[in-house]
Regions:
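Structural signal for hydrophobic/aromatic residues that build the beta-strand cores
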Residues: 43, 70, 80, 89, ...
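Conserved cytochrome P450 K-helix/beta-meander segment immediately N-terminal to the heme-binding cysteine loop
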Residues: 269, 377, 381, 395-427
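Conserved cytochrome P450 K-helix E-x-x-R motif and the immediately C-terminal K′/meander segment
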Residues: 57-67, 340-383
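Cytochrome P450 heme-thiolate "Cys pocket" and heme-binding signature region
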Residues: 123, 143, 297, 302, ...
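Cytochrome P450 catalytic-core helices
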Residues: 306-331, 449
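Cytochrome P450 heme-thiolate monooxygenase catalytic core
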Residues: 106-118, 152-311, 327
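N-terminal membrane-proximal hinge/A-helix region immediately C-terminal to the signal-anchor transmembrane segment
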Residues: 2-137, 159-163, 167, 188, ...
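Conserved, non-catalytic sequence blocks in retroelement Pol enzymes and Pol-derived host proteins
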Residues: 38-42, 56-61, 147-151, 266, ...
Length: 449
């Protein structure tokens, strides 16, 4: 008598799996396109049929630019996966990220991305904490980044800026080749935030010892997006493990080095007005050392990489618009006689500088895509449209800021749209300023803006 196990050979199992998988996949595709609750939303049918297209776009780093093109074609809301919608409408910011009567801390977060951002710690960080802990941690860190706290650190900040400028002059004098300003901005700002947080610089501009640590910090955000994408396809993570080995090695390097720097700072028992000192002194807020450890990696990233991107973009756009650069030079030099006059206290009433910073964050957003939220059951209304529960939703800043629905001549770097509100050439009456949220909105917006 033939036993059932004799028939269950590997070829038989593979054939059975294939016969079952193919019709199942066809049924899923048909359902996603024709019967899914999101079937009426515009977007490419290929992306509506499966999560594979958006998965591959995230893996190759093309998702944000593709979303911008899709919004230009399909409008203010695009279905980019069977259960995923991207928005650009101004009202979507409030509907997705702001508080409401039903959701005091906005629509619940999609935690896979945030956990990947924060690393594997036993205690929650600002981006992974529950509502109550988040409010407590945010109050504390907001004070650490207040104007008063930053003013106390102003001499240290100026010291790092002066060092960067001297380094750039030295590099320019030593070579006839172009100097990579973005590289030096990243190094200088990462050095600065480490000094502000741990009370000790890394000397990245002069010493290459810790540059691998600085480079590793730049992959945390994009790798978090990849980890979120891989969560939908566990088998892909196994298959792609050899390719992603270096990415995960750099992640380990970043988190472990941050831990070591924090441990060294805590063991020093010295007093210095840095962020760690501020936090350890705040005993009334009941912040634990484990929570400080969980948040330290985030502070490094938030205080360096995005600022370097914004400054690089500003320099590039000013060089491409020499007439604006000339106006900005006149504004700065008419206000400050010497470099020592440039202080936080004196950096007021500079409308063109303020407008240039706002405009570069629109044209070249440092954070081109916002983390997604997961719509609770049974659903919510976003930008005037009903969205079923279980849908991943977000605003794509790059697409929103470059949308002709929101901004007049959106591809043009035009600082005057932020301060010149009169005259026939004014952008004021043509732009939807509520669509401009470079630091997001709501209880989880950027505390370091």
């Amino acid at each position: 008598m033939t036993l059932i196990t004799d028939e269950l050979s590997l070829p038989f199992i593979l054939k059975a799996f294939a016969w079952a998988f193919v019709p199942y996949s066809i049924i899923c595709v048909v359902y996603n396109i024709f019967f899914h609750p999101l079937k009426h939303y515009p977007g490419p049918r290929l992306m509506a049929s499966s999560r594979l297209p958006i998965f591959f776009l995230v893996l190759i780093g093309k998702s944000v630019n593709t979303l911008e093109k899709l919004h230009a074609k399909y409008g203010p809301v695009v279905r980019v996966a069977p259960d995923e919608l991207s928005f650009t409408a101004a009202s979507a910011w409030k509907d997705i990220y702001s508080s409401s009567a039903a959701w005091p801390l906005a629509i619940p977060r999609n935690m896979v991305f945030f956990r990947a951002m924060a690393g594997e710690y036993g205690f929650h960080s600002l981006v992974t904490a529950n509502n109550q802990d988040h409010a407590r941690l945010r109050r504390l860190y907001s004070r650490a980044f207040s104007k008063q706290a930053l003013a106390a650190q102003e001499p240290l900040i100026i010291q790092h800026i002066d060092k960067l400028i001297k380094k750039l002059y030295a590099e320019i004098d030593q070579t006839a080749k172009p100097v990579d300003i973005n590289l030096y901005l990243n190094l200088a700002l990462f050095d600065m935030i480490n000094d502000l947080q741990f009370g000790e610089p890394l000397h990245l501009l002069d010493d290459t010892t810790h540059r691998a640590f600085a480079r590793a910090s730049l992959i945390i955000v994009p790798s978090a997006a990849v980890i979120q994408a891989l969560a939908d396809f566990p088998l892909a993570r196994i298959i792609l493990k050899p390719i992603l080995r270096e990415v995960f090695r750099m992640r380990r390097l970043y988190f472990s080095t941050t831990d070591q720097r924090l441990e060294k700072r805590l063991a020093s028992n010295s007093y210095r007005a840095d962020i760690v000192q501020f936090l350890t002194d705040a005993k009334s807020d009941n912040i634990s050392l484990e929570e400080i450890q969980a948040n330290a990696p985030l502070m490094n990233i938030a205080g360096s990489g995005t600022s370097a991107v914004a400054l690089s973009g500003l320099i590039a756009h000013l060089l491409l618009a020499p007439h604006i650069l000339k106006e900005l030079q006149n504004e700065v030099r008419s206000k400050f006689r010497t470099s020592s006059d440039i202080t936080m206290k004196n950096m007021v009433d500079m409308p063109l500088l303020d407008a240039c910073i706002k405009e570069v964050l629109r044209v070249f957003p440092a954070v081109p895509v916002t983390p997604g939220r997961l719509v609770p059951s049974p659903g919510v209304t976003i930008a005037g449209k009903w969205v079923a529960g279980g849908t991943r939703v977000y605003v794509t800043p790059l697409a929103a800021f470059h949308s002709t629905d929101n901004f007049h001549d959106p591809e043009t770097f035009a600082p005057q749209r932020w301060y010149n509100t009169k005259g026939e050439n004014s952008f004021a009456s043509k732009d939807v300023k509520d669509a401009y949220k470079p630091f997001s909105v709501g209880p989880y917006n950027c505390i370091g803006q």
